[in-house]
A protein has these predicted regions:
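Conserved beta-loop-alpha segment that forms the PLP phosphate-binding cup at the N-terminus of a helix
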Residues: 80-83
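Multi-pass membrane proteins that catalyze or facilitate reactions on polyprenyl-/lipid-phosphate substrates
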Residues: 3-76, 87-294, 298-413
């Protein structure tokens, strides 16, 4: 499309929307661009920053609503940070906000990964910034810890949920899959809480009636058909490289990726390195390293890999393919989340899933701390950051920048 046509379309869109709607969408876009540009450290950091912005600072959502979105997003494949952001975008800006929030969150990470991939192909190595970013890790850990503390106080409001949380967190350390723990935790919650929980129409926000039925959105059936088609195509293509085959691979992975984003590494190793030979072992390790030290979810390593394999077109195709299912799953969840609060048993299930999600986040923090808190300087930075952020509502970006400077001074001297 030519530039003047794009400009005309933009002007027409501005006239079509009222001032308040345009203001909401612009605030949403700015927020998601900021999150996408600064969310270093994984999905939990992005969720912590999102909680600070939309719950504590802007008060767009209550803590309970935010927890419901996190809990539901953990039940479907894909990066929770992207799906939660998209869902929040819909609640604040409608379907246009749904699209804008997702694009603005993903675009900065994809752009940064593409720049790193270009440098990698030009110089054959990673830029030397990993050592600097190591100093930010205690700050990131403190931000994550504060978010889990705040959300946990809302989610775990009785002894039954506390038992479920302890069970899920403990089981995760013994290697039980995240999705299994979420489903088991939800089922236990239905049994322990469903008998004791009464739901009024005011609490559910939905008028109750005897003939109310739980509706399964059409998007769910569309997703199942799409996944079946992908499996059929996947079983019948050769390992020769093309944009179409690259797209099929990442669509398939994104439709099946439950739990930690690190499961992605197993898919990449098994098919791109071992089966197809599209990547070398070193290229895969470098792609994962880049994803860890730059903003965005681990799945955004697909952008880096796409560029290595097929240049700019490969980066675009890989990025769209790895994140497209998240938009579809989020669209399916939008109608489901509100319905879950409309019934006693499903509300109990969601409460338990929320608690299980918080427990899994706590387990992630403990696991990360084992590799981050190995020096006394790291402990000092963690404690200072946590106390400051707990006492005052300091923007996460300032905490990260300040922590990086303090870390540089402490580790230098």
């Amino acid at each position: 499309m030519r530039p003047h046509r794009v400009l005309c379309l933009f002007i027409a869109l501005c006239f079509w929307m009222n001032t308040d709607r345009l203001k909401n969408l612009s605030q949403l876009a700015i927020l998601c661009l900021k999150l996408g540009s600064t969310g270093v450290g994984g999905f939990l950091v992005v969720l912590a920053m999102m909680e600070y912005e939309v719950v504590t600072r802007k008060k767009w959502l209550t803590k309970q609503k935010f927890l419901d979105i996190i809990g539901a997003s953990n039940l479907v494949p894909g990066p929770s940070s992207v799906e939660v952001t998209i869902h929040v975008g819909y609640l604040y800006g409608g379907w246009l906000g749904f699209v804008i929030s997702g694009i603005c969150l993903i675009f900065p990470a994809a752009l940064i990964k593409t720049a790193f991939a270009w440098a990698y192909t030009q110089f054959g190595a990673l830029p030397e910034i990993a050592s600097f970013l190591d100093g930010v890790k205690p700050v990131v850990l403190a931000v994550m810890l504060l978010a889990v503390t705040k959300l946990g106080k809302t989610a775990i409001n009785n002894w039954r949920l506390l038992i479920i949380g302890i069970f899920v967190c403990t089981a995760n350390f013994f290697g039980v899959s995240e999705i299994i723990l979420l489903l088991v935790g939800g089922a236990i919650g239905m049994l322990l809480i469903g008998f004791h929980q009464e739901l009024s129409p005011e609490e559910s926000g939905v008028e109750q009636s005897a003939n109310t039925k739980f509706q399964i959105p059409k998007a769910v059936f569309f997703l199942l058909i799409t996944i079946a088609i992908l499996f059929f195509i996947d079983a019948n293509y050769s390992p020769s490289l093309s944009l179409g085959k690259l797209s099929i691979f990442f669509l398939k992975v994104a439709s099946l990726l439950y739990g930690s984003g690190y499961v992605l590494i197993a898919f990449l190793q098994g098919e791109l390195v071992d089966d197809f030979g599209w990547l070398t072992q070193q290229q895969l390790l470098d792609a994962i390293a880049i994803a860890q030290i730059t903003p965005g979810p681990l799945l955004s390593s697909a952008t880096f890999i796409g560029y290595l394999l097929l240049g700019i077109p490969g980066a675009i195709v890989a990025t769209v393919s790895i994140f497209l299912p998240s938009f579809l799953f989020s669209a399916a969840l939008i109608s489901v989340v509100s319905q879950l609060r409309s019934f006693r048993w499903t509300s109990a299930f969601l409460d338990a899933v929320n608690t299980s999600s918080i427990a899994l986040m706590a387990a992630v923090i403990v696991k990360l701390s084992q590799s981050v808190l190995i020096y006394w300087q790291s402990w000092v930075i963690l404690l200072i950051t946590f106390m400051i952020s707990f006492r005052w509502k300091v923007n996460v970006i300032y905490l990260i920048l300040g922590g990086a400077i303090v870390a540089w001074i402490l580790f230098k001297f």
